[in-house]
């Protein structure tokens, strides 16, 4: 097969060399974006008088035909045509004849592929934002159902203070909200057009870059043609944002895995999101949560892979940039899948309120309450801290908990202790009292839920 760029060459490459250099096996995912970009480009060429209206109309009819074929998965791509751009151009010329060769006037594959990826990521980032909002809605529903479900809060994976389960869930809501904000902000840099930058230096044809950008829904154009064809910051930013999102999902999955274990028994996964063992019939494994945790690593890898590709590239385009796509495609697929699984997993899990309640009555997570009790009576907090530390030591030696210590023993430690101390030791009361802004107090959770619901409703409207 003769190449569309073959005029300079006297020998054809070996088949295995062609296969090594071809990208059609993966960049065919850009087929819709490539055709839509071409439709906008030829429309602009006609407006500027670079091609005739009749030629443009014939080209657009051919492109529309290919677009419909693509939507029905009827296009057949070839390695010999290398990439999505030359495959489409070859098919177009087979369909409408030599006039199809005018499509590439005033354009290079360098600005063409960059345009395709901007269009692709714009669409996918908007989808991901919607998927995050759906997950946030699930979190809000779970939080609403568990405002007064008391559980241990942890530091160093040691029981620290009693908190509301709703408060714990909403922590992830706000992590995800930051992820949404980052993705939304990245759209400012994704939604600009490199089309018309040419190979690197622009073009001698009197093109109208702003017009083609407007046709494609971009908010503006790259100001520098070298930057336009060599920039992959927008992909790196997407991979970085996705890495942070996956880190948040992975942290939550780690907790779900722990909570579903026999050692915790705080939650039970739905059978839909768990698997069994081929040898141990009693097992119910949290495989979906483990997979999300594991897939986080591949998204990190995609980010570092492209950073490494980019770090030594001189301006402008280099073939190394062919390596920018597979990690991007893989990350989109991974993130979309993980968000979908995460939402279903959280929506269908069963919360074991009784086990959570037992965990905060058979521990020392109420120790801070006693220290605060003494501090509220005028004792310096550091002295109160030391007294309570001795009380905890006394309890561990006796095999009892703070609620079991008689008042007389408390009074031996400090005359400030009174009968009302035992009200303070209630985990429910401890949670209720923590009513500072952003705290686990029930009033604060209600306020947080109102804000969270407002954000999810606003997203649904948009």
Swiss-Prot record:
Catalyzed reactions per annotation: 2-(N(omega)-L-arginino)succinate = fumarate + L-arginine
CDD domains: Argininosuccinate_lyase
Enzyme class: lyase
Primary residence: cytoplasm
GO BP annotations listed: arginine biosynthetic process via ornithine; L-arginine biosynthetic process
InterPro entries the UniProt entry points to: Arg_succ_lyase_C, Argininosuccinate_lyase, Fumarase/histidase_N, Fumarate_lyase_CS, Fumarate_lyase_fam, Fumarate_lyase_N, L-Aspartase-like
Keywords: Amino-acid biosynthesis, Arginine biosynthesis, Cytoplasm, Lyase
PROSITE patterns associated with the record: FUMARATE_LYASES
A GO-annotated cellular component: cytosol
SUPFAM superfamilies: L-aspartase-like
Annotated pathway: Amino-acid biosynthesis; L-arginine biosynthesis; L-arginine from L-ornithine and carbamoyl phosphate: step 3/3
Record localization: Cytoplasm
E.C. numbers: 4.3.2.1
Family the entry assigns: Belongs to the lyase 1 family. Argininosuccinate lyase subfamily.
UniProt name for this protein: Argininosuccinate lyase
The organism's taxonomic lineage, starting at the top: Bacteria, Bacillati, Bacillota, Bacilli, Bacillales
